């Protein structure tokens, strides 16, 4: 309907109609700049030794699932792979049909009335790359590159990347900033839990249910409902303050650090791809690294990429 309307306004001039749609797209982009583009289409493709993922984002799943929208995403990805583009800025300038990719997106925005934007462009280059579109739903795509040719292993690891969303290939690939942040979180959580344990023990000794006084809101509500007497409420506040402060002041730094280090090790195991528990094996539990070694003693992951529009 919008295309027909543009043609009518352009008196049958296709070039003028396209320009009208492009102008509408620009107006929509400006007007709806604060809108969320949480839906869209994510595609992945490999041609010879070059593979890429790209996402074209929009506002609704109705538009995202439309054949024209998916085709536009596919056309842009084809152009990117043909040009072996390495950045999203490069992709936006590539010819798609009779316009550049960004103009084609803007024109489609003018047709649908929704804000649209390109995102998530990433590439892998070289041999032994496997690509995966999760359930062929075009919302989550992955790519994995191995150091040896093993399509089955590559495909399974690509599924692993989709399912378990690793943050890094291995521990050495985790940024120092992430390690520092995770260790700080682990230390804070350990201190909090040890203090809470001491406070709860003191509350129970005083005959007070810790669940009834875990927040000031609960203390007030449970006092009104008769679960606590005013005296118990005041005693609970006093215990939480004094015991909490005393315990926090006497925590053993070495013990705290050891527990936090254990938590950091758990973070690496759960979030580093090679250390994750392999989800697609046939027998005993094994890590991804162990699975690869069972296929070929020198088989390793060179690199991986993952992009999704789904909330996780």
Model-based region annotation:
Residues 1-312:
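N-terminal assembly/interaction segments in proteins that build large macromolecular machines
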């Amino acid at each position: 309907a919008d295309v027909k309307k543009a043609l009518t306004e352009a008196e049958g001039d296709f070039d003028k109609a396209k320009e009208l749609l492009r102008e509408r797209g620009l107006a929509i982009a400006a007007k709806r700049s604060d809108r969320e583009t949480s839906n869209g289409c994510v595609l992945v493709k490999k041609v010879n030794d070059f593979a890429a993922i790209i996402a074209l984002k929009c506002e609704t799943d109705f538009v995202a699932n439309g054949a024209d929208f998916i085709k536009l995403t596919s056309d842009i990805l084809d152009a990117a792979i043909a040009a072996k583009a390495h950045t999203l800025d490069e992709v936006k300038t590539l010819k798609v049909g009779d316009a550049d990719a960004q103009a084609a997106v803007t024109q489609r925005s003018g047709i649908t009335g929704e804000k649209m934007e390109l995102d998530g462009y990433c590439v892998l280059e070289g041999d032994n790359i496997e690509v995966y579109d999760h359930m062929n739903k075009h919302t989550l795509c992955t790519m994995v590159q191995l150091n040896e040719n093993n399509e089955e292993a590559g495909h399974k690891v690509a599924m692993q990347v989709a399912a378990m969303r690793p943050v890094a290939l291995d521990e050495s690939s985790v940024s120092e900033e992430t390690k520092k942040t995770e260790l700080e979180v682990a230390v804070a959580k350990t201190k909090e839990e040890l203090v809470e344990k001491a406070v709860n023990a003191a509350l129970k000794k005083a005959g007070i249910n810790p669940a009834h006084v875990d927040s000031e809101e609960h203390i007030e509500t449970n006092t009104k409902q008769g679960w606590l007497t005013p005296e118990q409420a005041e005693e609970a506040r006093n215990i939480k303050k004094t015991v909490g402060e005393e315990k926090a002041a006497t925590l053993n730094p070495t013990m705290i650090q050891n527990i936090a280090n254990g938590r950091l090790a758990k973070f690496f195991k759960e979030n580093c791809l090679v250390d994750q528990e392999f989800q697609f094996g046939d027998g005993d539990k094994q890590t991804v690294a162990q699975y690869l070694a069972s296929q070929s003693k020198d088989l390793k992951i060179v690199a991986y990429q993952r992009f999704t529009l789904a909330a996780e």
